[in-house]
Amino acid sequence: MQSLEILAIVALVVAAILAIVVWTIVGIEIRKTLRQKKIDRLIDRIRERAEDSGNESDGDEEELSALVEMGHHAPWDVDDL
């Protein structure tokens, strides 16, 4: 094989690896965004129900706490120290 062919094959392999890494990062960020939207919807629903009456949001609070306990940190829990 000529050196140009070897270089082309190496470039294709590197491009494929970079594409896999980039799309993996994109997928992770999309999942984070979707989970955060779900948490935001639950918080809004809890707020609306808390305004209407006092005790109807218990199920939503349990679902929210389950989401937060799954390893997703709520935006108000910042530990940047």
From Swiss-Prot:
Compositionally skewed regions (Acidic residues) per UniProt: 53-64
Bilayer-crossing regions: 8-28
Pfam families the UniProt entry points to: Vpu
Principal localisation: host cell
Topology with respect to the bilayer: Single-pass type I membrane protein
Localization per Swiss-Prot or TrEMBL: Host membrane
Compositionally skewed regions (Basic and acidic residues) per UniProt: 70-81
Family to which this protein belongs: Belongs to the HIV-1 VPU protein family.
Miscellaneous notes: HIV-1 lineages are divided in three main groups, M (for Major), O (for Outlier), and N (for New, or Non-M, Non-O). The vast majority of strains found worldwide belong to the group M. Group O seems to be endemic to and largely confined to Cameroon and neighboring countries in West Central Africa, where these viruses represent a small minority of HIV-1 strains. The group N is represented by a limited number of isolates from Cameroonian persons. The group M is further subdivided in 9 clades or subtypes (A to D, F to H, J and K).
The protein's name in its UniProt record: Protein Vpu
Organism per entry: Human immunodeficiency virus type 1 group M subtype B (isolate RF/HAT3) (HIV-1)
